[in-house]
Amino acid sequence: MDFKKAFGAEVREVDERTRDGKATRVVSASRIYQTDQSNLWGALTNVKRISNWFAPVSGELYQGGRYQIEGNAGGTITRCEEPLALDLTWELGASISWVTVRLETQATGTCLILKHEMLKDKTSEAHWKKYGPGATGVGWDLSFFGLGIHICNDGEQLEREANLSWMMSDAGKDFMRDSAEAWSKAHISSGENEKIAQAMTARTAAFYTGEG
């Protein structure tokens, strides 16, 4: 498996909104994949294919059903409109957030737009003030990276041992540092103080690379 030319998201944004009258933060990432909507939708929703590039998923994978990602979040699929839109709750421990995915046909392929919305509650804010958007963003960058390899290799499985080896390598750590820095730039563009954003970035990069 060739990791050299692989990359994560192409566009990153940080925003604030409200949900049901409560303040939220939104981390958005997008990328154009050189494939059609149908193939990209299949990579995102087919149980076997999801495990090939992301993680094993179980449950009732249809609108209204519950899903569980092995060793990660679970939740409810609140919208499933093939091949355009997927909405779900993202439940991890006692926390709940919301993920939306949209697929848009472009001249050069299909654009995947992912938004992860989190409440500005006491627990989330403590985490945000320490790590900023990169805590969530770097994780999604790694997912975009894995999906890209899967798409470029005709649906081939991303070998777990090779992936872990790459993540522990200098190249893998550089990828995570670069991702954290890219999220810092998006954070600053949203209005965050540069020094505060850079401090968050340093902590995020240290966490992901195991050097903290």
Residue ranges of predicted features:
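Long, contiguous C-terminal modules that act as interaction/assembly or targeting platforms
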Residues: 1-3, 7, 26, 32, ...
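Short beta-edge strand/loop motif at the mouth of beta-sheet-based domains
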Residues: 21-22, 28-29, 35-39, 47-79, ...
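Hydrophobic pocket/interface hotspot
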Residues: 39-41, 50, 77, 86-88, ...
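Hydrophobic-ligand binding "helix-grip"
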Residues: 58-59, 65-113, 117-126, 205-212
